[in-house]
């Protein structure tokens, strides 16, 4: 049976981490297997909870999403690594399938996991939010997290670059993404600021009024129409309506903030940075 490691990065995740660690406990039953938690300065009980579950805890300053996940994976010793976010949960069915598949010594080097995104506690089945495949399970040292060059303005949405064949498992990784509207809006505020700064750094902010209106006014509305109507997001009820409405708002925020930052730069006014 191949040995298994789980890698998780954390910051103030005391509400989510117990659920995540409980969901992988059966995957690391061998004493040679491990859960590695890399924490970047939690002020709540995150570190204590990780240790209570028997995880190897490393405290390290925050270098960025991809760099922190690369570091966590580098500490893993298993033949296979499962990389998780602290708000993700391995379903019992997925847990069982992972064990069976890895025991069969598959020819593939990596597996996509279908992610079931929850918004205000409801599974978002439509509007492009499912199955949301993520490459999370792979042989050690065959993969590393890299910021995608084709989506540079999305610096926190890291992907895995790897060499080899990949397959998709049948069951779901449950993503407890946004339990409250406040949580979601704070998240979008932070992400839109990060995205705006990338646009400014790459010189992708136009002074044209037409371009400004296109990105701030029209793109959000067309995106909402596409995802909520044509991709059937309305079938996810009120939660679906709110998710697509506020995601469209995020798009508008990102370009409006980029315009604001670029204007401040041109006026010689510094803009305070913020961490992702």
What are the roles of these predicted feature ranges?
Residues 47-75:
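Conserved donor nucleotide-binding strand/loop of the catalytic core
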Residues 23, 27-30, 35, 39-48, ...:
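A conserved acidic beta->alpha catalytic loop
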Residues 31, 53-54, 133, 162:
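Short, structured coil segments at secondary-structure junctions
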